[in-house]
């Protein structure tokens, strides 16, 4: 399952069947698409399989996430997310992947009339009081079928990497929704230890959460829209890591750091949000 690490301007990875999913941008194309040097550097690093940090907004969660392209996940990446961030590891996926795999938002499942009638507790537990948004991005959680418990760094890396690779294979080969869902079930089970967050339809035009931001970075880098990440917390765990400390971490480890405004401004200037 080891991916092939690309150069800064191209992306390719080996699938389970040794086929390649490849997308390439010339340096000039990346420059035109990305614009500001800081954003360009971040996208080039991400396209090369390196991490990027994103602070959403002081008007939203006020959180910084450390992000990696899903198909480049290794046990070392998972360990870094676990040790350096402290928050929940999550897999952000593009809405087109969610549609192909028919992954429902948990909020929709929990408000399904038939299920609520069968399990009335779901009505008591409904999400109607989010302070940062109207709807949660969480869908199902998954484990790869070749994992044991699914929680080890090795297990979670396998789950993350193969989901990213499989998503690329599905999109590249034009599988039907049913074929995609069968392929997903062949390799994965639920529940699992990788929570999946699905992009809102319309992307950043409809929701400006970390899910949409993480997916947009992958798209800009020419990668499959699957990104693994975790929220960065204060050492005592009592709150999000202050943005100043997040920037210091980014500088210390030479990781590009962006804000939600950076990405929204880029998409606004280019007349697109996806």
Language-model segment annotations:
Residues 7-9:
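Cysteine-centered motifs
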């Amino acid at each position: 399952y080891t991916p092939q690490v690309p150069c800064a301007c191209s992306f390719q990875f080996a699938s389970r069947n040794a086929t390649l999913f490849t997308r390439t941008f010339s340096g000039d194309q990346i420059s035109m698409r990305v614009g500001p040097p800081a954003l360009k550097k971040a996208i080039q690093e991400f396209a090369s399989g390196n991490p990027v940090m994103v602070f959403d907004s002081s008007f939203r969660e006020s959180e910084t996430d450390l992000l990696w392209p899903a198909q480049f996940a290794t046990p070392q990446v998972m360990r870094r997310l676990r040790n350096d961030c402290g928050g929940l590891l999550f897999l952000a996926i593009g809405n087109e992947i969610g549609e192909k795999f028919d992954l429902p938002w948990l909020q929709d499942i929990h408000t399904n009339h038939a299920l609520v009638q069968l399990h009335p507790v779901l009505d008591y537990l409904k999400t109607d009081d989010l302070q940062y948004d109207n709807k949660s991005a969480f869908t199902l959680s998954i484990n790869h079928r070749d994992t044991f418990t699914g929680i080890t760094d090795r297990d979670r890396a396998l789950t993350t990497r193969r989901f990213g690779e499989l998503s690329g294979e599905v999109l590249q080969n034009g599988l039907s929704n049913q074929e995609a869902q069968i392929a997903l079930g062949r390799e994965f089970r639920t529940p699992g230890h990788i929570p999946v967050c699905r992009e809102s339809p319309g992307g950043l035009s409809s929701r400006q959460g970390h899910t949409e931001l993480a997916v947009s970075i992958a798209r800009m880098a020419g990668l499959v829209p699957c990104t693994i990440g975790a929220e960065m917390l204060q050492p005592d765990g009592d709150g999000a890591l202050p943005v100043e400390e997040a920037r210091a971490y980014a500088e210390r480890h030479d990781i590009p750091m962006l804000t939600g405004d950076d990405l929204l401004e880029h998409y606004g200037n280019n007349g697109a949000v996806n």
